[in-house]
Amino acid sequence: MMKKWIPSLAAGAVLTMNASICAAAVPSSALVAGGIEYGASADYVRQVYGTPTEVETKHHTLWNGEVTEYEYGDSFELKFVDGYARHIEISRHNGINTAAGIEVGSTLDAVKAAYGEPDKIRGDKYIYYCDEDKSIGLVFEIENNRVDEIEMGYLG
């Protein structure tokens, strides 16, 4: 009896291993945009990029407190909660890219070569969850097979 289910168990283990190898979740070390890591301090961002073009602080129910937004020009925005970067958005080709070198204007093929198949596609958004925390990750908005916008950090 035992000999009959051992091959099934082995086949199931192989299938499970293959499924996890194919997962596209990214490590937290991939959550970097423009040299700024998820969780970087606002002070560090100012050291790297200087004084923001605009600073706005407002109450945000999601984070149950104040959120401070830094804008650099009209295409690079960072949101800080308690002084730490929780969301970065790049909305135009401005030389700012991810740790894997993806920037606005990169091809969808380049995104997939860097990160694999997305964990989820929602409309024109290709979503890659962080393997340690599914509430954070990378989102690439794709228009005409090119990256039109990049979001990094909290995905809510």
Named regions from a protein language model:
Residues 36-38, 99-104:
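Short, surface-exposed ligand-recognition loops at beta-strand->loop->(often short) alpha-helix junctions
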Residues 25-26, 32, 42-84, 103-155:
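A cross-family detector of function-defining hotspots
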Residues 2-24:
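Sec-dependent N-terminal signal peptides of Gram-positive bacterial secreted proteins and lipoproteins
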Residues 18, 64, 94-97, 144-145:
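Detector for Asparagine
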Residues 93-101, 126:
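Hydrophobic transmembrane alpha-helix bundles
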